[in-house]
Each structure stands twice: as structure tokens, then as C-alpha cells.
């Protein structure tokens, strides 16, 4: 994402609003500023469309400058349209769980592209295999061994001088045709998808709600619709990670960790078995490092009972969730940050996990927004539409949002960024059985 400092300065009054939690992360500020800019552009286009429909506004039109609307200050970022939308974007966007469990790449248009470059072993006519990923093929640029190490998966038991490539002798080098290498560019298309909700209310309801409770019906419905849309996007991100994560701790055959099985754990006390669960998490994190060559797993999504089991081991530092609460961006919809495991793995509790079905999902997310297995790509977060029923003359309100969701091109073997079950190398999931025994 290209970070435009002009947007950050333009939206500074909104980003630094004193009544809202501060956005300390520079990238979150940049993403929020860009999405606010997209929101403003969408509202301006909507206003121009309305002007094309009517030569003059009717006398009873309700807009941002009407007595029933809210007006932005002249010259301010929200001038000329309802700031309720801007406020919702400012509150909602930084609290998305996606910032912590996947990458966030805002879109500036309805479609976008993600490019990835792969180094390749090649012939003079075609690519033959990816390079600079797993262990280097020692015979490729030198003299071939009898059984190249590349076919042995670096199994130390099978490594001998006979199957390790060496440099070429002068006689061989003077006459040998050198091997080819090259690169290919993978292109992944991201297309914005939409979500929308609507609500209707009567003028009588609005009048009574205002008179008795002092509440504005449109504002309350706006909050309900926007909160529901945000909650649905959050759950889509979480469930997509669950579905696309590779299965198992090491390999696809170990999809379960059984605390009552001697094959998985052995301990006299329950807390000793829980420490075996920690080792299972470490093995999954190590497997992610081998598959991605980016880093060990540093993020963990667990069910409630698994989080409690981890805390019983004494290695889940939940104090960080209290002392640094202002920086953790705990999701308002219920997904909570539990603390740090081993001082480096962020642990998130999924409050919607079904009782009796315990699991853990280990994932990796790098320091930059480009280093993740899944990308959430917001385009227009909230677009509000007001209407009046032509028969009853009762008001209606609707919301639509547009965003994309795509896998990292390097996250799957195909490299196409497709969201497919059990294929994403950046995440691994396994079920935890008999946690109460």
C-alpha cells in the first residue's frame, strides 16, 4: 500500500479525536486514513448522483444540513455530509481483529492485483522448480552427487559425501554448459465483494423514542446495522482462517491432540499434560516456519478451555493484556486478547467456540502488513442510504460495505491466492481432546 501523508494530515482531526482511543500504530493510522478517503469519495459520488436525479432539492429534503441531520464544518474533512459515517469508520476500522491475525491491504478501487516473484530453477525452455525456498540444491551449480540432497529432504541420516554436490573441477567447468535460473511473477486478482443490511422504522416510533427515552431512532438503527456488519466481517476472517489452515501438528495425519492418550502426552498431574499441549503448539509453530520460510508461528487462536489450560501452566502471561490494554485493540464484538505465550505468541480466545469442542489454530503474521497468510482488503467500509417508503411514507435506512479477502500467493502450493480448504501454510489447526481429564 502506498502511504500518502496528505491523507494522514487531512484526517488528523478525526484520527486524533480526544473522545476516541488513540491509534498508536502508524500503519493502522495510514490504513484508516485511506479508507476514510475512500468513504469520502463514495459519499461525494452518491451526492453527485442525487443531483443528477433532481434539478433542485425538494423543500422537505433530509440531508446533512437539515434540522434532522448533522452538518460538517465548512472546510473540514467531513464537510457537506453526515459525520456519523466518518465516526463509525474511525471507531470500527482500528478494532478489526484482522490487524492481529492477518494482513490488511486497503484497496483504492473495486479490483486490485497482488504480485509475487518466485525464483526458479530452469532450463532454456521452461521453469523446473522453485529456488531460494527450501535447502539449496548443492549440485545444481556444481558437480552432481550420486543422489542429490534435494531429493532427501535434508534427512541427516541419509547425508553422505556421495549425495552432496560439490564444486566442479577445472576440466569439467571449462566444458560444461551452465544451468539456467530465472524468475516468474505470480499475479493474484482481488475483487471487492459487498455486504448490506437495511432497517425501517415509523415516524411514530421515532417520536415516542425521542420523547420517552431521549434516543434517536435512526442513530440507534445505524449503530445496530454497522455493528452487525463489522461482526460478520470479523467472523468471516476468523472462519476463513479456520477453514484454510493446514491440518495437524506435523503432517496432515495428526489432526488431534489427545490429552488422555499416552501417544500424545504422559504426566502424573493435569498441569504436566497441559505442558505437553504447549509442546504441540511449538511443533505446529516450527512446522509453519519450515513451510513458509518466513518465521515461526507467533499467533494462536484457541477455544476458551484451551486458553484456561495454557494459563494453568504458568507460561501464559495474561498481565500483558492488562498493562498494555490500550495497545492491544481488543475486538468489541467479543474476540479477546488473552496474553502472550512464551513472551512472543499472541493468544486470542474465540468466545464463540462450542462447549466440548476444543481446538487451537497456530498462525504466523510478520512485522509488516505484507507478511501474512491472508489479506483483508477494505474498499468502502460503510455507505449509508436513506429512503422513504412511497406507500407509507415511513423512513428507511440501509448500509453497504465493500471489501476483498485473498490468500497470500505464497500461502498455497498453487500460488494463486485462492481460498481453499486445508491449504494455507501460514496457519495450522488441530483439535484438543479430553481437556478435562
Stretch-by-stretch model annotation:
Residues 217-218, 233-256:
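Short, glycine/acidic-rich hinge or "gate" loops at secondary-structure transitions
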Residues 1-22, 244-245, 257, 316-330, ...:
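Short, intrinsically disordered N-terminal pre-domain segments
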Residues 82-83, 92, 98-100, 171-232, ...:
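Sequence/fold signature of self-assembling virion shell proteins
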Residues 123-142, 243-247, 410-426:
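Short linear, low-complexity motifs centered on an aromatic residue
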Residues 70-78, 89-98, 107-236:
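Acidic/polar, low-complexity extended loops/arms that serve as protein-protein interfaces
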Residues 248-273:
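Acidic/histidine-rich catalytic neighborhood
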Residues 1-139:
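Extended assembly-interface regions of large multimeric machines
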Amino acid at each position: 500500500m502506498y502511504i500518502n501523508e496528505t491523507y494522514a494530515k487531512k484526517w488528523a482531526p478525526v484520527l486524533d479525536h480526544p473522545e476516541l482511543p488513540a491509534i498508536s500504530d502508524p500503519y493502522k493510522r495510514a490504513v484508516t486514513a485511506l479508507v476514510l478517503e475512500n468513504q469520502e469519495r463514495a459519499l461525494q459520488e452518491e451526492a453527485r448522483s442525487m443531483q443528477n436525479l433532481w434539478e433542485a432539492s425538494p423543500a422537505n429534503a433530509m440531508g446533512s444540513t437539515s434540522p434532522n441531520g448533522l452538518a460538517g464544518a465548512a472546510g473540514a474533512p467531513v464537510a457537506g455530509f453526515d459525520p456519523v459515517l466518518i465516526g463509525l469508520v474511525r471507531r470500527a476500522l482500528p478494532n478489526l481483529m484482522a490487524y492481529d491475525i492477518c494482513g490488511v491491504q486497503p484497496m483504492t478501487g473495486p479490483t486490485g492485483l497482488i504480485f509475487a516473484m518466485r525464483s526458479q530453477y530452469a532450463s532454456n525452455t521452461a521453469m523446473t522448480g522453485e529456488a531460494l525456498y527450501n535447502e539449496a540444491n548443492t549440485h545444481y551449480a556444481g558437480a552432481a552427487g550420486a543422489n542429490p540432497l534435494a531429493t532427501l529432504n535434508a534427512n541427516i541420516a541419509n547425508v553422505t559425501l556421495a549425495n552432496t554436490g560439490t564444486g566442479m573441477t577445472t576440466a569439467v567447468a571449462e566444458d560444461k554448459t551452465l544451468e539456467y535460473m530465472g524468475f516468474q511473477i505470480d499475479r493474484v486478482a482481488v475483487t471487492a465483494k459487498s455486504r448490506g443490511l437495511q432497517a425501517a422504522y415509523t415516524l411514530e416510533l421515532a417520536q415516542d423514542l425521542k420523547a420517552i427515552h431521549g434516543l434517536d431512532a435512526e442513530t440507534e438503527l445505524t449503530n445496530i446495522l454497522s455493528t452487525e456488519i463489522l461482526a460478520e466481517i470479523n467472523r468471516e476472517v476468523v472462519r476463513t482462517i479456520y477453514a484454510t489452515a493446514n491440518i495437524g501438528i506435523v503432517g496432515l495425519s495428526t489432526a488431534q491432540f489427545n490429552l488422555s492418550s499416552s501417544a500424545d502426552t504422559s504426566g502424573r498431574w493435569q498441569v504436566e499434560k497441559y505442558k505437553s499441549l504447549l509442546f504441540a503448539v511449538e511443533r505446529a509453530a516450527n512446522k509453519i516456519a519450515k513451510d513458509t520460510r518466513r518465521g515461526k508461528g507467533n499467533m494462536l487462536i484457541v477455544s476458551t478451555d484451551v486458553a484456561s489450560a495454557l494459563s494453568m501452566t504458568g507460561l501464559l502471561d495474561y498481565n500483558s493484556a492488562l498493562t498494555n490494554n490500550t495497545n492491544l485493540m481488543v475486538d468489541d464484538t467479543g474476540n479477546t486478547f488473552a496474553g502472550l505465550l512464551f513472551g512472543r505468541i499472541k493468544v486470542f480466545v474465540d468466545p464463540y467456540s462450542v462447549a466440548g469442542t476444543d481446538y487451537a489454530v497456530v498462525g504466523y503474521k510478520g512485522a509488516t502488513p505484507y507478511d501474512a497468510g491472508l489479506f483483508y482488503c477494505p474498499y468502502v467500509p460503510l455507505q449509508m442510504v436513506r429512503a422513504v417508503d412511497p406507500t407509507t411514507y415511513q423512513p428507511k435506512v440501509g448500509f453497504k460495505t465493500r471489501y476483498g479477502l485473498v490468500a497470500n500467493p505464497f500461502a498455497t502450493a498453487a500460488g494463486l491466492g485462492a481460498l481453499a480448504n486445508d491449504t494455507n501454510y501460514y496457519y495450522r489447526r488441530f483439535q484438543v481432546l479430553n481437556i478435562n481429564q
